[in-house]
Regions:
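Glycine-rich phosphate-binding segment of PLP-dependent enzymes
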Residues: 1-43
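Buried hydrophobic positions in well-ordered alpha/beta secondary-structure cores of metabolic enzymes
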Residues: 7, 31, 54, 67, ...
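Active-site nucleophile and cofactor-binding loops and adjacent substrate-binding regions
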Residues: 17-24, 42-48, 72, 157, ...
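PLP-dependent aspartate aminotransferase-fold enzymes
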Residues: 26-120
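Active-site core of PLP-dependent enzymes with the aminotransferase class I/II
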Residues: 124-150
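Conserved Walker B
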Residues: 127, 155-157
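Catalytic P-loop NTPase motifs of RecA-like helicase/translocase cores
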Residues: 130, 159-160
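Active-site PLP attachment segment
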Residues: 171-192
């Protein structure tokens, strides 16, 4: 009930403002305080916005195109091109996306070596239906550093459910970029 009352109060003030608001600054400060990887914050409407921006940032920063991923990552062409729902997506887009298996560090290392020097990022959910085993996340971080690849944790599902700092706070592995949505706003349209 407290959340709903706060939501109605904010709806009366406005929700999509063209200039930075005090509320955005306040939330940004809280996020950078509690989330280990958060040095800056960019707001969006949903998890797809957050993961799209993260991949674009990684590609710009590294000047590389390939994406290695595991887990679910919404509706971007790079992700959907590797699924059975790929109708309407140019086939060549799938040439830049490569799935590895969660908890299988060898499958990730094989892809990093196969596309050496061309991988922009590793996009992954830090935890999903199974917990990380055998220092999996620590080894992913090591390989990302070794290959100079941006590590992105998609915490759209996990963020703020496990900890105020996301699952990264619990596991002690800090990604280069993080994506949050859903739980951050109790299902309302917001992502960071």
């Amino acid at each position: 009930n407290q959340f709903n009352n706060s939501l109605v109060k904010q709806l009366n003030k406005g929700t999509t403002l063209s200039l930075t608001s005090d509320l955005e600054i306040e939330l940004s400060e809280l996020i950078t305080k509690y989330v280990p990887s958060a040095e800056m914050v960019r707001f969006g409407k949903n998890g797809n916005d957050a993961t799209t921006v993260a991949v674009r940032l990684a590609r710009h920063y590294t000047k590389r195109n390939h994406i290695l991923f595991c887990g679910y990552h919404a509706w971007q062409d790079w992700y959907v091109s590797k699924t059975s729902m790929n109708s309407g997506i140019p086939p060549e887009i799938s040439n830049y996306s490569h799935r590895f298996n969660y908890n299988d560090i060898n499958s990730l290392e094989t892809l990093l070596n196969k596309f050496k020097g061309n991988v922009a990022c590793i996009m992954m959910e830090p935890i999903s239906k199974v917990e990380p085993q055998d220092n999996f996340l620590k080894n992913v971080r090591f390989l990302a550093n070794k290959h100079k690849v941006v590590l992105i944790f998609d915490e759209v599902v996990t963020g703020f459910r496990w900890s105020v700092g996301g699952y990264q706070k619990i596991c002690g592995i800090t990604p280069d970029l993080s994506c949050f949505s859903k739980a951050i706003s109790n299902g309302m349209p917001l992502s960071v």
